[in-house]
């Protein structure tokens, strides 16, 4: 029986044009087509429509030879950024989206990262180098009426308990 495998009418492993296994009960090689007609299928051919069957035209397979063709468009944002320690790290989806939003990225993120890397401060702390006087400096996120808008982090810090 082994010498008859691969020939028409014998139990060979059959695959469709995409390499998926095809059982004996599926369309092709002698099974009844949905319209009642019989499709004739030879080696490497396409099944035609029988009397009353549905006809599907042969598709040409387009192969690129293993080369990935890319479109000409590119994104202006890179997938990695400086981590402040001399290395690089991957950006998350949120960071990529924030970069693309208009007016949302004014360099605050890079300035904050540079300050963290240079001063060695903890995350979220801002440098208060000259404010050692007892009660005479600006305290925390309370800026007074200097005409400066509060930043996003300052608004969050205000709402946290025990940070005053």
UniProtKB/Swiss-Prot annotation:
Induction description: By abscisic acid (ABA) and water stress.
Swiss-Prot/TrEMBL keywords: Stress response
Amino acid composition bias (Basic and acidic residues), ranges on this chain: 147-164
PROSITE patterns hit by this protein: DEHYDRIN_1, DEHYDRIN_2
Listed Low complexity bias regions: 107-117
Location of region: Disordered: 1-164
Any one cellular-component term (Gene Ontology): cytosol
GO biological process: cold acclimation; response to abscisic acid; response to water deprivation
InterPro entries associated with the record: Dehydrin, Dehydrin_CS
Compositional bias per record (Gly residues), positions renumbered to this chain: 25-53
Keyword flag Membrane: no
NADP keyword on record: no
Family indicated by similarity: Belongs to the plant dehydrin family.
Protein name as annotated: Dehydrin Rab16B
Classification lineage: Eukaryota, Viridiplantae, Streptophyta, Embryophyta, Tracheophyta
Gene of this entry: RAB16B
